[in-house]
């Protein structure tokens, strides 16, 4: 039964009513198209409303006159606005609703609202009267909407789809306008204002459902748009584009993390293409790595994206030979202020993240007591579906830049060892020594590590601070003892170290006497130390340290800083200006090879010159002060001196040979990459019991593994050892 059969039993009457409604279709469509051109004028909207009401009345009167009965308006609407023509209906109604939104924006314009920033209005045309007219337009527009929804057109079937399209289009326009007005950046507060404004507008036209139908799509559109420049925002421009990342975070929250998987894969692809290439310096990769940690941690509270993206960077960094040294330098120099703040604020909540990966295996860190107390276990949420096992756990969500950088090492022991070496280098340098900063930074490290792990660093720093106190006492002592020596006492600043706690220094034993002024100063310093520390004595490392010298050549004074081992030879030229190699060897008690190499270094620096006219073994003090180059502490290489065997216990290393078969199988079968670090093997060896009474140290284990590297049985890349697979016959 058709819709007209329900109105009357007369087929002839039904057909006449159908023909009459179809005849009104062209009249309605022509009126809609005509008045749409002038929709910004509310009078034209009134006229269109009148047309719709008149057509509806004519249809009803025709039905009564022809005996059709009481027809259903929806039946007539299907003939005039058929559902199959929905796209055309949406296009025809667009000018009306866009004009309404324009008047709504102008009527609601407030300069202090974020969404209205950047709008340029013609002050001559913008008056309170104009604003009142716009407000009246908004109110008078509703009868037209009601007529569309309930009148002869029954357009309520199309309205939700139409308003959804308009809202999506308006959102895109407003978002792009805000980005252009604020340096291509979409701030979350502005985006929220835009969405709230569109929601209120949908309420104004009594179409609230349309906004809720399309809002998720708008959030997805904005997230996808911002994702196109995600690499620059996250790894390059952070924190400049930080506000756009907050907008992305807001979109993820509103859409239940829709698109996060695709975004993660896209970002990993961008990282592999633009960052993880041979032409990018390790420092720049570390900078981008730290930026990714900070930005992605803020954008995604679950840290799923951060762990996936940073995991790719971390695996690449492990294959770079200079990563270990660059990380410790980056942490303690380039980013020390930011990391200091980060460490102090989050130290209590991330201690568990500092555990070794080996120690974390098999541990359910969701239920660590410390995490329960600090991370709010009562608000526990399950891990996201796209999270790798373990990445959503509280122990991983609490990580920060410091922890993520340290994780590249693979173990805390390696980080502490490298930090100890760097600290020794910086504390023993006279150029950039800063005990106060090192003390403050070490105190922060104590919040992340156990005291026993940093005990060596604590003692080293205490030695330096104590040495500064001795230096001050030495100044007073030198003034009182000046009359006891034939030469003036030159100032000395010494670093008194506890050799057991400091890294092994490259030194040489020499019996050569120091120059008389320097020896006198050393004697006074020794007396000063004995006054402070009874029953102790100093053992001077004569080849370590630097001397600040002032050379006067023909009235031109040149100030330079040179290492002690070279200054000893230079002081000889105060006695006479020309020396032979044999005379220097006899005077200093050094070998001929070492003597010649050090004299050649002085020649290279411009302090002395050879006199080939007299003899190739004759050395003369220079007469050209401009030829003396600038020398900084540590510039000469010690490798030019005589080869010295390392002081290691070879018996202890040989004793580890009995475990080589087990070691080879352990490394080959070690998951996931078939590689281990020396620290891990050290812990394994301790499980078996010490091969000797003292037991192997980490240095012994490292020496044993390096021996296997030299034999071609292992490879070592960035501190990780791997078995070299034997090639089969015919390969």
UniProtKB/Swiss-Prot annotation:
Record-linked SMART domains: APC2 (SM01013), CULLIN (SM00182)
One biological process term in Gene Ontology: regulation of mitotic cell cycle
UniProt xrefs under Gene3D superfamilies: Cullin Repeats (1.20.1310.10), Cullin, Chain C, Domain 2 (3.30.230.130), Winged helix-like DNA-binding domain superfamily/Winged helix DNA-binding domain (1.10.10.10)
GO CC terms in record: anaphase-promoting complex
Alphabetized Pfam families for the sequence: Cullin
Family matches, as InterPro entries: APC2-like, APC2_C, Cullin_homology, Cullin_homology_sf, Cullin_N, WH-like_DNA-bd_sf
Source superkingdom: Eukaryota
Disruption phenotype: RNAi-mediated knockdown results in defective metaphase to anaphase transition (Mat phenotype) and embryos that arrest at the one-cell stage.
Keywords for the protein's UniProt record, in alphabetical order: Cell cycle, Cell division, Developmental protein, Meiosis, Mitosis, Ubl conjugation pathway
Pathway membership: Protein modification; protein ubiquitination
Record GO terms (molecular function): ubiquitin protein ligase binding
Known role: Probable component of the anaphase promoting complex/cyclosome (APC/C), a cell cycle-regulated ubiquitin ligase that controls progression through mitosis and the G1 phase of the cell cycle. The APC/C complex acts by mediating ubiquitination and subsequent degradation of target proteins. Developmental role in early embryogenesis and the metaphase to anaphase transition in meiosis and mitosis.
Family note: Belongs to the cullin family.
Assembly mode: The APC/C is probably composed of at least 12 subunits: apc-2, apc-10, apc-11, cdc-26, emb-1, emb-27, emb-30, mat-1, mat-2, mat-3, such-1 and gfi-3.
Name of the protein in its database record: Anaphase-promoting complex subunit 2
Lineage: Eukaryota, Metazoa, Ecdysozoa, Nematoda, Chromadorea
């Amino acid at each position: 039964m058709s819709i007209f059969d329900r109105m009357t039993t007369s087929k002839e009457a039904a057909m006449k009513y159908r023909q009459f409604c179809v005849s009104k279709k062209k009249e309605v469509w022509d009126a809609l198209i005509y008045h749409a051109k002038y929709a910004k004028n509310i009078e034209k909207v009134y006229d269109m409303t009148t047309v719709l009401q008149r057509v509806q009345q004519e249809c009803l009167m025709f039905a009564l006159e022809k005996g059709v009965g009481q027809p259903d308006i929806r039946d007539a609407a299907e003939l005039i606005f058929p559902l199959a023509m929905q796209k055309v209906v949406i296009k025809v109604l667009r000018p009306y609703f866009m004009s309404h939104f324009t008047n709504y924006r102008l009527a609601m314009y407030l300069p202090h609202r974020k969404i209205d920033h950047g709008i340029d209005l013609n002050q001559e045309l913008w008056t309170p009267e104009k604003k009142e007219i716009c407000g009246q337009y908004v109110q008078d527009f509703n009868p037209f909407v009601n007529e569309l929804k309930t009148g002869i057109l029954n357009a309520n079937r199309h309205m939700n789809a139409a308003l959804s399209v308009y809202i999506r289009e308006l959102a895109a326009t407003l978002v792009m306008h805000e980005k252009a007005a604020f340096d291509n950046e979409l701030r979350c507060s502005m985006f929220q204002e835009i969405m709230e404004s569109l929601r209120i507008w949908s309420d104004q036209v009594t179409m609230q459902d349309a906004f809720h139908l399309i809002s998720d799509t708008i959030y997805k559109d904005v997230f996808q748009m911002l994702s196109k420049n995600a690499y620059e925002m996250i790894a390059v421009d952070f924190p400049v584009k930080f506000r756009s990342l907050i907008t992305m975070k807001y979109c993820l929250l509103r859409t239940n993390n829709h698109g996060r998987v695709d975004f993660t894969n896209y970002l990993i692809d961008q990282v592999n293409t633009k960052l993880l290439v041979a032409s990018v310096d390790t420092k720049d990769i570390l900078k981008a790595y730290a930026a990714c940690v900070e930005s992605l941690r803020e954008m995604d509270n679950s840290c799923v994206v951060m762990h996936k993206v940073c995991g790719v960077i971390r695996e690449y960094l492990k294959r770079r030979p200079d990563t270990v040294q660059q990380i410790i330098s980056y942490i303690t120099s380039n980013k020390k202020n930011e990391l200091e703040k980060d460490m102090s604020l989050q130290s209590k909540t991330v201690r568990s993240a500092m555990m070794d990966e080996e120690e974390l295996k098999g541990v359910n860190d969701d239920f660590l007591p410390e995490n329960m107390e600090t991370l709010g276990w009562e608000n526990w949420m399950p891990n996201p579906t796209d999270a790798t096992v373990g990445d959503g756990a509280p122990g991983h969500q609490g990580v920060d830049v410091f922890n993520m950088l340290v994780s590249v090492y693979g173990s805390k022991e390696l980080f502490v060892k490298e930090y100890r070496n760097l600290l020794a280098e910086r504390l023993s340098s006279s150029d950039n020594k800063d005990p106060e900063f090192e003390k403050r930074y070490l105190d922060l490290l104590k919040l992340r590590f156990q005291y026993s792990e940093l005990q060596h660093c604590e003692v080293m720093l205490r030695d330096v601070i104590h040495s500064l106190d001795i230096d001050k006492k030495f100044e007073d002592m030198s003034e009182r003892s000046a009359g006891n020596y034939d030469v003036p006492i030159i100032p000395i600043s010494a670093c008194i170290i506890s050799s057991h706690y400091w890294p092994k220094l490259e030194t040489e034993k020499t019996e050569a006497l120091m120059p008389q002024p320097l020896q006198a100063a050393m004697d006074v310093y020794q007396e000063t130390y004995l006054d402070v520390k009874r029953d102790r004595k100093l053992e001077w490392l004569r080849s370590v340290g630097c001397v600040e010298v002032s050379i006067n050549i023909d009235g031109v004074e040149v100030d330079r800083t040179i290492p002690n081992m070279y200054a000893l030879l230079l002081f000889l030229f105060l006695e006479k200006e020309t020396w032979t190699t044999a005379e220097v060897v006899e005077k200093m008690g050094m070998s001929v090879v070492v003597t010649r190499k050090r004299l050649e270094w002085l020649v290279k620096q411009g302090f002395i010159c050879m006199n080939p006219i007299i003899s190739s073994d004759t050395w003369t003090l220079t007469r050209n002060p401009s030829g003396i180059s600038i020398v900084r502490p540590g510039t000469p290489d010690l490798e030019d001196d005589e080869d010295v065997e390392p002081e290691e216990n070879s018996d202890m290393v040989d004793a580890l040979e009995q475990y080589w078969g087990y070691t080879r199988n352990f490394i080959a079968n070690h998951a996931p990459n078939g590689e281990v670090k020396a620290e891990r093997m050290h812990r394994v060896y301790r499980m078996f019991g010490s091969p000797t009474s003292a037991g192997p140290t980490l240095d012994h284990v490292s020496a044993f593994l390096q021996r296997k590297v030299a034999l071609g049985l292992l490879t070592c890349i960035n501190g990780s050892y791997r078995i070299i697979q034997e090639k089969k016959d015919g390969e």
